[in-house]
Amino acid sequence: MRTFHREARMPESIPASLIIDTLKDTFREARAARAAEGWGPSPHEHLGWILSVPDTHQKTVLAALDKEQAIRVLTCATEDEACTIAAGLHAGGEPVVLMIQHAGLYASVNTLRGVAMDGKVPVFYMIGLLQREKDKDPKESRHSMVRYCEPLLDTFSVPHARLEGPNDVHLIPEYYRLSRQRRGPTAVLVGLETS
């Protein structure tokens, strides 16, 4: 299992524009990889899909994506729905990222296991740690949803990393690629609300 930990440092908010630019680059790379595998050209102009369940932690990214023409956004009713739609989009050759909060991870563990793990579907999650205290390691949070998020991912052997600031956005394409390589779920945890 590959888990990324670093020395403690104060997390910083990541600008929405930086995340969106990183997602665009990630989707471009994914499309090029699919083309190299023999997939034909995309029948549309957008680069990839964001599947979200209403998420206050990453709301600035989702609001900015509403104006973004290069990335399609689909708001789903549940994380289970988002995961199964992601499986269908992947089967059709479409790059896709799920943006959820930690509560949604807990709510959709069976789908994570059944679709992404047992079905060997590469699902990449960006998980917002709502109520994460800036001055504490998430595993020491007084909020159980924050405190148990990483241990839950560890229990299911889901590789994950923390996005603790702008210098960590390189983890988005890294863990996206890892989900494809291992044919299963990976996640990055968004430490603070995006700006």
Predicted region positions:
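Thiamine diphosphate
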Residues: 1-195
